[in-house]
Every structure is written in C-alpha cells, then in structure tokens.
A protein has these predicted regions:
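Non-catalytic accessory segments flanking enzyme active sites
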Residues: 21-22, 28-71, 76
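Rieske [2Fe-2S] iron-sulfur-binding domain
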Residues: 60-162
Length: 162
C-alpha cells in the first residue's frame, strides 16, 4: 500500500498543475502515459471495481463469431452464441492454460485448444477431452467436464458496448 500512497501523491501533485488556471497549467508528464508503475496503480484504482467497455456487439454480428482481445493483460474472447447471446470468457484452456483463439474468427461452432485438442462449445462448455484417459480413451473419472468449462467473465451490453 505504501507504493500506492507514493503514486497517489505524485498524481495529485501533477493534477494540480493540469487543473491550474489556464495560463499556469501544464500537461501531465510523459511518464504518466508510459510508466508501468502508474498503469498498475490505475488498474487497481480505476478499472478493478468499475465496468469497462471492451468491445461492441457489432464486432461479432453473427452466431459463431469470436473476438479475441486482451484487457488489462487478461486474454479474453467475446462470443456470439447459438442463442444469439453475447458472452465473455477467459481465452485460456482449462487444461494447461494455452491461449485458445489467437485472432478474431467468424462462424465457429467450437473452440479447440491447439495444445491437447480439448474442445469447447461457443457457449464455453467443455465438450471433449481427447485421450485424457490414455490413447483412445476420451474420458477419465477425475475429469468432470461440467466443472471445466471456460471461465465466464460477467458482462453486460449497453448501447452495443460490451
């Protein structure tokens, strides 16, 4: 927390010059746009407890459209499901953490992990786990498919903004 207080004091001091009378005001120092330390502070204080727009519904107009993106260093996918719903998931396989979708795609029925071929429906449900129980055995008693779907991120749509 001491680091946060230090950064907060730097921000307040710099904002005083920005908010000064127009003849005396100056812009923020360049480091405010490039500092990893300030970005971490902003992630914690600005973004973590607030809604943030990450995409538009019009980015994925058709069933099976998937938009891959990263928000605050978290890989995400935004999906238009078969029920015409929009859902947001972590873009990470639940098996070994591999990125599932490298770039946005259209008209997909499944999301397949490029590492071990685990397959998810576009609704995030785990559909298949090839050879998880050995060659030719696609099931294992310790693998509960109902518990291993993609992690959904709570989302809402407002004026086409997701």
């Amino acid at each position: 927390m001491e680091l946060s207080v230090h950064i907060e004091n730097k921000i307040k001091k710099s904002l005083n010059t920005v908010n000064s009378n127009i003849e005396l005001s100056k812009g923020l120092p360049n480091k405010f746009y490039t500092s990893e330390e300030i970005f971490e502070y902003e992630k914690e204080t600005v973004f973590s407890d607030n809604w943030c727009g990450i995409a538009f519904g019009s980015d994925i107009p058709d069933v099976g459209d998937i938009k891959a993106l990263e928000f605050l260093s978290i890989p995400l996918i935004v999906v238009r499901t078969e029920k015409e719903q929009i859902q947001v998931f972590e873009n990470v396989c639940r098996h070994r953490g591999m990125i599932l979708v490298e770039e946005s795609v259209k008209n997909k029925k499944h999301i397949r992990c490029p590492y071990h071929n685990w397959c998810y429906g576009i609704d995030g449900k785990l559909l298949s786990t090839p050879h998880v129980g050995g060659i030719g055995n696609h099931n294992h008693e310790d693998i509960k498919k109902n518990d291993l779907g993609l992690n959904e991120i709570r989302s809402h749509i407002w004026n086409d903004t997701i």
